Amino acid sequence: MDWDRRSMLAGLGAAALPFQQRPTEAAAGHRTRLILLGTAGGPRPRKRRSGSAQAIVIGDKIFVIDCGDGVARQMALAGLPLRQLRHVFVTHHHSDHNIDLGALLQLAWISGLVTPVDCWGPPPISGMIKDYLRYQEHDIALRIKDEGRIPLAPLIRSHDLGDGGPVFQDEQVRVTAAKVPHPPLDLALAYRFDTPDRSIVISGDTRESEELVKLAADADVLVHEVMLAQRVRELVRNLPNRDALARSVISHHTTAEQVGRVA
């Protein structure tokens, strides 16, 4: 994606999941928070907006969904300590959603991370993280030797996901994934987070999807990508491949009207 679009925050209006279907009741002060760290579409840097990324904060644990350009800085601006990062979920492997995955992990480590971080996403997320650690092995080794830091690699646990289903559960959250259509990729995922006080669904990039509708049933909050087709045509009108590019972009994403139907 290389055009402007906003992630649309849509409350679904239905009741949240009954309490007995949720993880353990949250302790006082452990309410679930959602922070939109970046809503820009496409990898091209913007003056005022950062790449696709969201944070869900449950107690003192931070869950990051997608790692677009600037995610670590946006966390700092939002007052989210990088050392409290516990899970990273990548929806799909386009660069505007994963370009800062490795940087986020390394910067969290530099910021005092000593607790393992689980990274989830479509293949080849495990290989990508290994490649990033090799790319930065000189800096990492120097910081371990010179600054007395613990090794970074053992702190990162990566998980290649399949087509959907249960992903992770503990006493505070249950995470479920669903496969969504985002050609030409073979696998793109949406995620649902059920906590004691709310249910949040992150669509990632997708066309209108019945699987996403099922995943988001009775959720409290849906963060859904949205594309303005006319705006796409305006942005590409001076490019030599404008017709093919516009046709590709519009067929791979969700219009505002379609998002309304999903919600």
Residue ranges and their predicted role:
Residues 2-5, 9-17, 22-201, 207:
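Binuclear metal-dependent hydrolase catalytic cores
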Residues 189-190, 197-199, 207-263:
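Cap/insert and terminal regions of metallo-dependent hydrolase folds
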